[in-house]
UniProtKB/Swiss-Prot annotation:
Keyword Hydrolase listed: yes
Lineage start: Bacteria, Pseudomonadati, Pseudomonadota, Gammaproteobacteria, Alteromonadales
Catalytic reaction list: N(2)-succinyl-L-arginine + 2 H2O + 2 H(+) = N(2)-succinyl-L-ornithine + 2 NH4(+) + CO2
Any one Pfam family match given in the protein's UniProt record, by short name: AstB
Keywords from the UniProt entry: Arginine metabolism, Hydrolase
Protein's UniProt keywords contain ATP-binding: no
Protein name: N-succinylarginine dihydrolase
Pathway info: Amino-acid degradation; L-arginine degradation via AST pathway; L-glutamate and succinate from L-arginine: step 2/5
């Protein structure tokens, strides 16, 4: 039986804009009110996804959410026609309108936490959508995320879908952006690392002072229970509160793992040595590589600005590992120098491939934000909705779809344009036919 780690990238939605919605995310705040290009953003994402498929990796796409989200605007008291609702919201509550127009679902690292069948007691692949309660614009995503995941992984013989956790800050859950999995082989039982920012039920425990800790220990423990994980294959690690306060809002901004490699910054975690020992003990006797980047070589500020750790570490068909990095890493002298040195060291990482995802980067999301990792065996891959898997035909079809429906430029003030609702719904309705998703959106029901 062959085993793979698939990447399911978020297709950037038609309302991709820079509204500066994400407190704690430095890039998002710094680029607030800039002009975006939904068309460029979608094409950059597709190009990156296709390149990984061409490298021989299993690559899928996850559909975007319906935006503007008129259903939520109606829930909070706006009424009338679609045009009237947008007009009223723009005048009376512009911040709420912006929140209901975000294309943030493109960052599918926050879509869900995924545990492969090799790790779970029932031998199924488990999905729990993240509730994303810390940010209003993301907290309205989980129900549709669940619909899209179920339409993509739609065979109950192999896939188990859970409801997102209770919508309360005690269970603040940001999905796979705070989760990674180490294993000797993708098909072997691994060690799942859950990284949290604070303990909700322990006020005296360490936590950041400036920016919010979006993930709680309680949420991570709940997901592990839902996924039927063994305690011997689970490690809970607290992220260093000081780096959260420097803009490291998710763990995938300061660390990333793949198979037997954990690539992380020296300041990423609390109690680092004790936790590395726990990982090693639970991992077993197989080779395990801890690749620690010292502050003396890459400062936290450079790591955040370049998104050195918001890279994908992937295993190529040759068995070597490669880092999929944003071009911003080439533009930062300290980071570029480090990556050039890294590929010469005694680790499985032997090459770095650079991609332009600047439209996403300017909103605070690098290559790793754009993908949800799903480790699968060949039977599970065959059970996935095949219309969501990247190949030459889907790449061509989705690029044509973007050309047909997406705007070249979008300003925040354009979000109140009633035509944008029509354009977005028309595009998504066609997309559900291309990807054979069924009626996953509110407007289709």
């Amino acid at each position: 039986m062959k085993h793979f780690e698939a990447n399911f990238d978020g297709l950037v939605g038609p309302t991709h804009n820079y509204a500066g919605l994400s407190f704690g995310n430095v890039a998002s705040l710094n680029n607030a009110a800039a002009t975006s290009s939904p068309k460029d953003a979608a094409k950059q994402g597709l190009k990156k996804a296709k390149a990984l498929a061409d490298l021989g990796l299993v690559q899928g796409m996850l559909a975007p959410q319906e935006r503007p989200d008129l259903h939520t605007l109606r829930r909070i008291g706006f009424s009338g026609t679609d045009a009237e609702i947008l007009n009223k919201a723009a005048k009376e509550a512009p911040a709420l309108l912006r929140a209901c127009c975000s294309a943030s679902s493109m960052w599918t690292a926050n879509a869900a936490t995924v545990s492969p069948s090799a790790d779970t007691h029932d031998g199924k692949l488990h999905f729990t959508p993240a509730n994303l309660v810390d940010k209003l614009h993301r907290s309205i995503e989980p129900t549709t995320t669940g619909n899209i995941l179920q339409a993509t992984f739609n065979d109950s013989r192999y896939f188990k879908h859970h409801q997102h956790l209770p919508e309360h800050t005690s269970f603040g859950d940001e999905g796979a952006a705070n989760h990674t999995r180490l294993c000797s082989e993708y098909g072997h039982a691994g060690v799942e690392l859950f990284v949290y920012g604070q303990e909700a039920t322990n006020p005296s425990a360490p936590k950041p002072q400036k920016f919010p800790a979006r993930q709680t220990l309680e949420a991570s423990q709940a997901v592990a229970r839902l996924h039927q994980l063994d305690d011997n294959g689970t490690v809970y690690i607290q992220q260093n509160p000081d780096v959260i306060d420097q803009g490291v809002f998710h763990n995938d901004v300061i660390a990333v793992g793949n198979q037997n490699v954990l690539f992380y910054h020296e300041q990423a975690f609390l109690n680092t040595q004790a936790k590395l020992t726990e990982i090693k003990n639970k991992f077993g006797d197989s080779a395990l590589h801890f690749v620690e980047v010292p502050t003396s070589q890459v400062a936290i500020q450079d790591a955040v600005k370049s998104y050195l750790f918001n890279t994908q570490v992937v295993t190529l068909p040759s068995g070597e590992m490669a880092i999929i990095a944003p071009t911003n890493c080439q533009e930062n002298p300290a980071v570029f120098a480090y990556l050039n040195e890294l590929v010469t060291l005694d680790t499985p990482i032997k090459q770095v491939l650079y991609f332009d995802v600047k439209q996403s980067m300017q909103n605070g999301g690098g290559p790793a934000c754009l993908r949800l990792r799903v480790a699968m065996n060949q039977d599970e891959v065959a059970a996935v909705n095949q219309h969501t898997l990247m190949n030459d035909a889907l790449f061509t079809r989705l690029n044509q779809w973007v050309d047909k429906h997406y705007r070249d430029r979008l300003l925040v003030e354009d979000l109140a344009d009633p035509q944008l609702v029509i354009e977005s719904r028309t595009a998504l309705d066609e997309l559900t036919q291309i990807m054979k998703l069924g009626s996953v959106y509110q407007f289709q029901r």
